Amino acid sequence: LRKLKSILLVDDDETTNFLNKFFIRQLDNDLTVNTVTNGEEAIEFLEAVPYKKHMPCLLILDTNMPIMNGWEFLDVYEKKFDKDFKKNVIIVMLTALDTEAVTAMAMSNPNVTDTAQKPLSDLKFRVLINKYFS
């Protein structure tokens, strides 16, 4: 397992981003936590970020957002980034509804590593981080 260096929160709800950032800070104060409010901003952020400095990265992706939603983000992400980049990004797709259909759709995408139901808690973050990172 690799050591987690950064988390990118992609959600149009500022309150959700604030709370998630708070939970993460309680777990590990050394982590770099960035927030963007839609998929388009996430793509721009990932293109601009100095690759090595922030990898590996945990990307928490909401499904429903304006401008570019989570599904559209995944389509652009697939085309824009190479395999070496993608192997260092763990994408967890957030679902507001715990439906098998949404989970199955997310998990059928090769770039999605896991799904989680909103809202996240400090316990859910701890489980996700421990599952994929040392």
Language model features with spans:
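Conserved acidic segment of CheY-like receiver
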Residues: 5-16, 20-24
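Conserved active-site segment of CheY-like receiver
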Residues: 12, 92-98, 119
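Helix N-cap/capping motif at the beta->alpha junctions
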Residues: 35-44, 48, 70
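Short amphipathic alpha-helix used as the core "switch/output" element in two-component signaling
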Residues: 44, 71-85
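Active-site beta3 strand of CheY-like receiver
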Residues: 50-60, 89
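Receiver (REC) domain active-site loop signature in two-component systems and cognate sites
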Residues: 65
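Alpha4 helix (beta4-alpha4-beta5 surface) of REC/receiver domains from two-component response regulators
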Residues: 72, 87-89, 97-115, 127
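C-terminal output helix
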Residues: 120-129
